[in-house]
Amino acid sequence: MFKKSSWYALMTILVVAATALSACGPAATSAPTQPAATQPAESKLAVGIVLPTKDEPRWIQDETRFKDALTAAGYDVQILFSQGDSAKEKANVEALISQGIQVLIICPQDGTAAAAAAEEARAAGVKVISYDRLIRDTDAVDYYVTFDSVAVGEAWGQYLIDNATGTGHNLYLYAGAASDNNAFLFFEGAWNKLQPKIADGTFVIKNSSEAVALQSKATLTREEMAKIIGQVTTNWDFTVAKNLAEANLTAAPAADKGTVFIVAPNDGTARSIADAFAADKDVTKYYVTGQDAEKASVQYIIDGKQSMTVLKDVRTLVADAITAAVAYLKGSTPAQTNTYNNGKIDVPAKPSAIVTVTKDNVKAAIIDSGYYSASDFTGLP
């Protein structure tokens, strides 16, 4: 049993964590604060968290924010990393179950492979919150905390369209891991925007025969997207991304270079791909997308090496995940504004908004919102 003061301390942390989700444009606005609970929880927050890897800055940020929020409120939390290994991920879940957790927050390395771990948690009476990436092909998922992943891809497509005049622009497509459901959602969003402009000749696909074969289709099935992603996957790996980009450039004639437009699936791969294109003497200019607003990519944007990123304010996502966990611990149901089909069920969800960041609004979106400090960067506009 814990005191009301502990509950109020927790909710205070949630409010702080959810502050200032920036608006897209020259000014930043604040994200809604989490609703105050009417009753204190009856037990300590028994939550285990499993994140995919320590090798990407994004997940280290999430670890820090989860740990800071829960520790400051007086709760113990254990955060384990799967390091890109689904077997280790399952072992992590089993270890947390053995410690008596009541709620599992898990960002799966492989959405389909994680189904077995989710089912084991469900069998133990644990509520399962799929965090940022969706666990697929199982009914053992209670809730999905995510950003609007389709909107992320649409932001990429719209940015490239806004910077393309005329026709015949060289387009290079890259994607995340084929094992990650989000990679499909991001690609779906990008295709939603780009396909009409591919069909009318604004863009010409240069690095995927599968995409060329499907370019007349406004809506792709998952199987069709899988064919394209299979050709252009980076597997979320910076080295894979760089090697693939270099291979594409080696195979491309000079006419397929010049000014190029590039769909890159996240900031780490965007930097690697941008470096490869920048090093090619036949590439005169490039526009490249990204997401996660990693510090290194924010600096790349300031320096003109990366064109844009999509800010997904993990403070809001962490706060939403904790709020959902608290709701389950109190015997209630988290707020729902949407559902995502995971191949087996429609999973309740509350997707958070995203913000497009370019050099024009980087200060408002990143610095003025409090997401990062100005001292983290040089040459801010």
What are these regions (language model features)?
Residues 3-4, 25-381:
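A residue-level marker of the well-folded mature domains of exported/periplasmic proteins
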Residues 1-11:
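Bacterial N-terminal signal peptides that target proteins for export
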Residues 18-23:
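C-terminal motif of bacterial Sec signal peptides marking the signal peptidase cleavage site
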